[in-house]
Amino acid sequence: MNLSDLKRNAYMLRGSDAKRGYMRWWHSFQGICPTTQETRTFFVEYSILNPALGTSQPILGQHPYYKRHGLKPSYLCIKAGVFPEPGDSGLQLQAYYPLTSLQVAQDPFYMQFEDCVYSENRISGSIDISDEVARHRSLMTDAGSFIWDLEVHKAVACHTGYIANAFFTAVHALGSFWHGEGIRTFFRGTV
């Protein structure tokens, strides 16, 4: 089970998957405020949807204009925030970017759009959502800002075995494939 396979964690949306596929890299972690010692649980998610359909603007499938014109969604998305706790509603920020801003390297895997960076050993970026933007319900975001810069050490992987190998992925044997490269991960940095 604890078998690292970085190829399964890399960008894989090619061929028909690039027109009808998505990938996401989800991170959930706790941070401790150095002054108050309060512990909070944060999350950062990088996702890509239908990259072959991308244009110079993000196409949001839930937006009425795009629905009317029959356009399929295609975008990069950063979602970040803090989970709610008793007496605190938490925060979820989502920012969408065009596929034209994506830069990807495969070996080692590295992805960047705008100032948001993802690699096997570092995640960093920022989101700043104004009240005006947050009023658009189709964007599904709160208003606020969030900045993160974290070193990532993936200690335990969850290898899903042969059913998610290159052959079964290529022939679309399953509707989706999952690989947990860092089901136990240590983070160090600032939020």
Language-model features: locations:
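Targeting-peptide/extracellular-domain and disordered-appendage signature
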Residues: M1-V191
